[in-house]
């Protein structure tokens, strides 16, 4: 996009009524006039995007390829605009050239633009006041926006992750899974359902049998019922899948795997409770859950079970086994072989070997009474029941012991739907701060999940954005060799923020890393157009000085005004083409609905809005500020500072 803009600026500067014999010389002079500004504007776009490489974690992996691609393209563009473009112009731009005044489009644009710029100069306080007011309004709009780590990506599928009680049996969880799959298939938008309970056949999956994972593949949107959204489908499925003893959870397959790998949390947000005793941790986690209930945006609220697992305790009676001439190992061996099985031998089938195990049948070990009747063989007293030498009972314990940093851990899990992540967690933190004083000594809380990523990315962006502005200012200073001219171009950045803030507010987009990257790209585009305007305004000042000299006695305020208007109106068409090319490239993305458009739209929205407002500011306000600066110079120093634009 910037490459086409650079060629347009260079080409439009040759559209003058010139004799054929001086064509090459005029082309050379025209290219030299804008080459420095065009080159440095391209460099500014490159350098302003460099801080994106400072992003780390998931956001870094997502946006680094974009930054690399844009950087390499713009480096090639910066080289071509000062080497190849002049050569191509000399090859293809031949014959008779018409003046810009003969172009009907240009005449219409100038007839519209000149009264506007004269009105802005006449009502300068009103013009500046309106711009400052618009900028002031954009600040509370930005502050009122929600916050999230990354825009939610529609994967085209759902992951249903319900959990049951920790003591659920294999047969019961299988029945629940079948019932759930049957209910899910009744929704018209569902194409396929694939569910599993427990862990996969891998050593890295520690999912208990009480955890169910069901992948729901959805049909194409064209086959959905009219007006249905993904949120509506989730709500409908959730209402139909209300099964006693089962807590529902909804997410998407890819983001779920990313969350579990990066944070160890399978939901959007996890509140980790650390301590020394599992019962105390679980009791406090239940209190946290009760406080979180009713908060807008908190969905699928659930306390990870760390108690409630069922165990069979076999406590050997040492006095009794001594009476029967048995040892503890003898009793344990009987229990192990009866319940877990004992390896008897190994069978060889070809190159494969299989162990042969034996254990009691299901009917002899599926209840406490049957276990008590297990026969234990003695040397002198024959077979005796197991209950004669051991106490057998059911007890409760942790179904899984989770620890982190050598401390026991419990977790309160929930997803965020229907509200932004930042404000949801902020409200939850305010509500839970009152409970912090009631935490027992040695216990503490830690927020995890996507909120952990949000905090990290916000800290990085607070460092990146000031660096972007400093880099842009330094690049413009080296381009103009004047801090005043650099500041005049840089002032377009906050006014570009106006359009970006307005459009993301009315579009209903939350602030995220994607929006921040869009603003970073916008700042480079805004300054790029401002540099061209400053070049032509300084060119007009050169013409004024060449004609009337550079002193208070020869230059009047009226002269300054007329030459500024002439410089602003000069090459109006390529300036507007810059805006149009940017909009034509970006606007189609706003109406895209394919996979990935959820991430692209937050990047593009601030760029579209910012290009519109920055273009308005550059065309109407930049000449006004430039004129006021020159009037101040003439009044204070008796002459004006003229920037050399021909190199």
Question: How should these model regions be labeled?
Answer:
Residues 27, 31-34, 42, 46, ...:
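Signature of alpha-helical transmembrane segments and their immediate interfacial
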Residues 2-29, 58, 64, 83-135, ...:
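Interfacial helix-loop-helix hairpins and adjacent transmembrane helices
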Residues 1-2, 35-54, 62-101, 214, ...:
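Transmembrane alpha-helices and their membrane-interface boundaries in multi-pass membrane transporters
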Residues 16, 20, 249-251, 282-468, ...:
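Extracytoplasmic/periplasmic membrane-proximal domains and adjacent transmembrane bundles
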Residues 52-62, 132-168, 223-225, 254, ...:
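Transmembrane helices with small-residue packing motifs
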Residues 53-70, 148-151, 439, 480, ...:
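Short helix-loop junctions at transmembrane helix boundaries
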Residues 1, 72, 80, 471-571, ...:
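Hydrophobic transmembrane alpha-helices and their membrane-interface caps
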